[in-house]
Design a protein with these regions (language model features):
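Extended, low-polarity segments enriched in aliphatic/aromatic residues
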Residues: 2-63, 73-82, 87-373
Length: 373
């Protein structure tokens, strides 16, 4: 794998009367080879994060419009998509998720296409996809609408992440396309836990479980027998009180490897293209209902057929920047304020693990050639 993958780059500089930023992104995407993909009469999934309500760092819907319009220009049928979240918030079921997306501007009038929440109303509509060579994941649970698409395009807001280190293309694909059960598998050992204070003893979990894992004490409260649990996550999606949750016991390195393995399940065997914007590089995920000062100045737009090379190029670009004054990393006593900003932000994480594992799985190369337009 000595050959370098091409990653195309454009900065955010605009000159009067030439092109605006959406036009610049369109030119970048087409220069990178987007037009070579056969999209005629094909369903094209555009995977992105709509942002938790209250967060202001997520990608604006204008960016999604650029991609959707290019897909339609090539005869494709685009839709924006994401999967539901594990945690309480505005995106844990499809209705709330779409409402949150609308609040943040992602409606058909702004984006030129509709939204499909890939894992359905309650996050239980998934497809089990084999992962060849997976160290931790043998069968990934991917949102059905993602797998039903003929072409897959990722549109990523490149940023930090408290567990993975950074939230790039592989996180957008791997974690983002996992159903609620899939996210539980990535975040934990794959076995759920019951929050006793929320359990009302309705036994919905026992009814849906095919393995007899839910057990009930003298108060009627549920508990999960991990020796019987198969880790399917169905109880998590069926509980009406959100009393069942993931254990969140996966070490950061394991989480990163699982994300790479889930990414392989998504992209394997069909045309894919990846876009990443290094803008408003917040230290935390857009899943937060708030966002801190960006870690570094805005860098630009990147695009590639190779998601591994794309993440590496974006990471290198961020690391090369000085810390932004006012950010959590800026130290007035330090003249350089450089280094691995993601590692500095989240010392217990290591984003390199995800890229190393993805390369090992054959998802792409870390070696890249940057092509500026």
């Amino acid at each position: 794998m000595s050959e370098k993958s091409k990653v195309y780059f454009a900065d955010f500089r605009c000159f009067p009367m030439r092109e605006n930023l959406p036009q610049r992104l369109a030119r970048l995407i087409m220069t990178a080879g987007f037009g070579s993909i056969d999209m005629d009469n094909k369903y094209v999934a555009i995977k992105m994060h709509f942002g938790e309500p209250g967060n202001q760092a997520y990608l604006r819907p204008n960016w999604a419009r650029v991609v959707a319009d290019l897909v339609k220009d090539q005869g494709g049928k685009p839709f924006l998509t994401d999967c539901n979240t594990l945690y309480m918030g505005g995106r844990k079921n499809a209705l709330d998720h779409i409402e949150s997306a609308y609040q943040n501007g992602f409606n058909p009038y702004n984006t030129g296409c509709h939204i499909l929440i890939a894992d359905g109303l309650k996050g239980s509509d998934d497809v089990e996809v084999p992962v060849s060579g997976g160290e931790y994941v043998k069968t990934a649970k991917i949102g059905r609408a993602v797998m039903d698409a003929d072409v897959f395009v990722s549109l990523t807001h490149f940023k930090g992440h408290e567990q993975a280190g950074m939230g790039g293309t592989l996180k957008n694909i791997g974690m983002g396309c996992g159903s609620r059960a899939g996210k539980m598998e990535m975040h934990s050992s794959g076995k759920p836990v019951v929050k006793r204070e929320k359990c009302v003893g309705c036994r919905a979990c026992a009814i849906i479980c095919a393995h007899g894992a839910p057990q009930f004490d003298e108060e009627g409260k549920a508990d999960i027998d991990i020796n019987q649990c198969a880790g399917c996550g169905r109880c998590l999606t069926i509980c009406p009180k959100d009393a069942i949750a993931a254990r969140n016991d996966a070490a950061p390195a394991i989480l990163n490897k699982k994300m790479a393995e889930y990414s392989k399940a998504v992209v394997n065997g069909r045309p894919c293209f990846h876009i990443s914007l290094v803008i408003d590089v917040s230290p935390h995920c857009d899943c937060h209902s708030e966002n801190d000062v960006p870690l570094v100045p805005n860098v630009g737009m990147f695009a590639s057929f190779d998601p591994v090379a794309l993440d590496q190029a974006c990471a290198d670009a961020v690391v090369a920047q000085p810390a932004l004054p006012g950010s959590m990393l800026f130290d007035e006593a330090c003249a350089c304020n450089k280094g691995d900003h993601f590692k500095r932000s989240h010392p217990n994480s290591d984003w390199n693990v995800c890229l190393e594992h993805a390369e090992k799985l054959g998802l792409g190369r870390r070696a890249y050639k940057l092509v500026r337009i």
